Amino acid sequence: MTNFRKTNPLMKIVNNAFIDLPAPSNISSWWNFGSLLGVCLILQILTGLFLAMHYTSDTTTACSSVAHICRDVNYGWIIRYMHANGASMFFVCLFMHVGRGLYYGSYTFLETWNIGMILLFTTMATAFMGYVLPWGQMSFWGATVITNLLSAIPYIGTNLVEWIWGGFSVDKATLTRFFAFHFILPFIITALAMVHLLFLHETGSNNPSGIPSDADKIPFHPYYTIKDILGMMLLILILMLLVLFTPDLLGDPDNYTPANPLNTPPHIKPEWYFLFAYAILRSIPKKLGGVLALVLSILILVLMPLLHKSKQWSMMFQPISQCLVWILVADLLTLTWIGGQPVEHPYIIIGQLASIMYFLIILVMMPVASTIENNLLKW
């Protein structure tokens, strides 16, 4: 009798994606983050669904509805904090996943990489809108500052901002539409993730050595299913440690104060996972220049296939490029730190130097390092 999973049309798709999928035998734990992102997405959709059942997207009641969820709803506090800290875990996995793609040259799979970039932008948009929903001080002023950046676009900027706001300031209309978008976008992310997987399975996974692994493949199940389950258990352990011991560690105390348009917080800053981009934005005194730098700080990843000058796929055998990647990581951590600091000396100059360094490493140093390594190997 033929195996059910190989004959049933629906099970055949699952089988070819997660069971009988030929996978390289040497992929490391850096390849775990794709499945961890899937777990984060499912967790965020489920917790978000239960939060949406009790949340009201009205400026007068939004903040108190979040307090009501935490105080009066059965296990509402754990759902709320799992959702808030789940977003942080999502971005940790996302940054690791993109970093692995950069290090091991996964950007050579053009379709997979470009859909991954769309996924990154969509996830960032979703997280930003989610941060506005509790309608605390940081929610309100964060929304005001970030949406206002669009006014830097020549000719249409001001009209565009008012169109997004649904009025002349961030108000009820803005909150309602942000809630609507925040609810629908995760489902769009799910669809995009499926397309991402579809294109990945057309080419097969990359591997640390960057050498084609067609001659040495193993089935995905049980080898990598077990490995992924271990990763998932560790992810959930870290998330629950955060939720149960320090739920507000990554949040901002200002967001427990209900939004007040007449009182600006001393330091307006986004969630920690946007701080690096925020630091790049602030490092340029001109508004339009800052906005362009902000967009380019993420969009630069789309250029990675064009900037790839090495004759090798992976950085496993490229010591100079390896050093540059870790300098880039240190630079991003510096930018994240600067993004959370007030705009004063010496933070301004550190932020400007770190921003210049960020673009310099990616656009100049890495292609030059690859060319040097090619010449050293007489290629």
UniProtKB/Swiss-Prot annotation:
Superkingdom of this protein's organism: Eukaryota
Binding site for heme b b566: H97, H196
Keyword vocabulary terms for this entry: Electron transport, Extinct organism protein, Heme, Iron, Membrane, Metal-binding, Mitochondrion, Mitochondrion inner membrane, Respiratory chain, Transmembrane, Transmembrane helix, Transport, Ubiquinone
Residues that span the membrane, as ranges: 33-53, 77-98, 113-133, 178-198, 226-246, 288-308, 320-340, 347-367
Primary location recorded for the protein, binned into one broad class: mitochondrion
Cofactor note: Binds 2 heme b groups non-covalently.
Cofactor: heme b
SUPFAM superfamilies: a domain/subunit of cytochrome bc1 complex (Ubiquinol-cytochrome c reductase), Transmembrane di-heme cytochromes
GO CC terms in record: mitochondrial inner membrane; respiratory chain complex III
GO molecular function terms attached to this record: metal ion binding; ubiquinol-cytochrome-c reductase activity
Pfam families in alphabetical order: Cytochrom_B_C (PF00032), Cytochrome_B (PF00033)
Compartment(s) of residence: Mitochondrion inner membrane
Binding of heme b b562, residues: H83, H182
GO biological process: mitochondrial electron transport, ubiquinol to cytochrome c
Membrane topology (UniProt): Multi-pass membrane protein
Further details from the record: Heme 1 (or BL or b562) is low-potential and absorbs at about 562 nm, and heme 2 (or BH or b566) is high-potential and absorbs at about 566 nm.
Annotated family: Belongs to the cytochrome b family.
Assembly and interaction partners: The cytochrome bc1 complex contains 11 subunits: 3 respiratory subunits (MT-CYB, CYC1 and UQCRFS1), 2 core proteins (UQCRC1 and UQCRC2) and 6 low-molecular weight proteins (UQCRH/QCR6, UQCRB/QCR7, UQCRQ/QCR8, UQCR10/QCR9, UQCR11/QCR10 and a cleavage product of UQCRFS1). This cytochrome bc1 complex then forms a dimer.
Functional summary from the UniProt entry: Component of the ubiquinol-cytochrome c reductase complex (complex III or cytochrome b-c1 complex) that is part of the mitochondrial respiratory chain. The b-c1 complex mediates electron transfer from ubiquinol to cytochrome c. Contributes to the generation of a proton gradient across the mitochondrial membrane that is then used for ATP synthesis.
Protein name, UniProt field: Cytochrome b
Organism: Myotragus balearicus
